[in-house]
């Protein structure tokens, strides 16, 4: 009986371990992107897009790369190749679980993607973080840094022609801090 319990415990430990770490990476990616949005030394530019300025895709690609998900290392460079590479790096397509009109179902860390035009990341409470446009309403030629407070910013979810929503494994939640694996001893 003891050997069987140990075998079952090991099975479930191994099974659940494949999802461990997802929430920490989600939090790291979200927090990094929000930090960039809150720092006016970073603005929008499609020419100088890997820091200190970013465009919509480079902001999210760099956020996930910094969080330990190797999307940039695996070739993600723009909205047109994000879907395939993000899926290969542990994301799943959860578009069918989302009401794209209202944003209902979008979770913290979800990538909202229009493959041709734009991407943003859900940060919870009906909010997204995104890089939008430079101070002239364009994509290139602005000054370094955020001149308007809305070049890279957080805003409410909005209805956009999103093609898909990608979620990192074990996405959206925060791991409870006081959960321990214990051995059950019958009384």
Language model features with spans:
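Low-complexity, Gly/Ser/Thr/Pro-rich intrinsically disordered linker/tail segments
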Residues: 153-187
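Acidic, glycine-rich loop-and-strand cores that form catalytic or ligand-binding grooves
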Residues: 81-83
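Short, well-ordered loop/turn sites that connect or cap secondary structure elements
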Residues: 100, 104-107
């Amino acid at each position: 009986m003891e050997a069987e319990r140990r075998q079952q415990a090991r099975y479930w430990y191994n099974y659940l371990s494949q999802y461990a770490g997802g929430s920490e990476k989600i939090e790291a990616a979200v927090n990094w992107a929000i930090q960039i949005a809150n720092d006016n030394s970073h603005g929008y530019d499609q020419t100088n897009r890997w820091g200190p300025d970013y465009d919509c895709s480079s902001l999210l690609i760099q956020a996930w790369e910094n969080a330990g998900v190797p999307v940039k290392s695996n070739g993600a460079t723009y909205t047109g190749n994000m879907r395939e590479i993000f899926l290969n790096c542990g994301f799943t397509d959860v578009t069918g679980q989302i009401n794209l009109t209202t944003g209902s179902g979008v979770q913290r860390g979800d990538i909202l993607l229009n493959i041709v035009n734009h991407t943003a990341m859900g940060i919870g409470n009906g909010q997204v973080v995104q890089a939008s446009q430079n101070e002239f309403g364009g994509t290139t030629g602005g000054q370094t840094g955020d001149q308007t407070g809305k070049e890279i910013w957080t805003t409410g979810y909005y209805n956009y022609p999103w093609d898909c929503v990608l979620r990192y494994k074990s996405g959206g939640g925060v791991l409870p801090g006081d959960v321990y694996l214990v051995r059950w001893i019958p009384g």
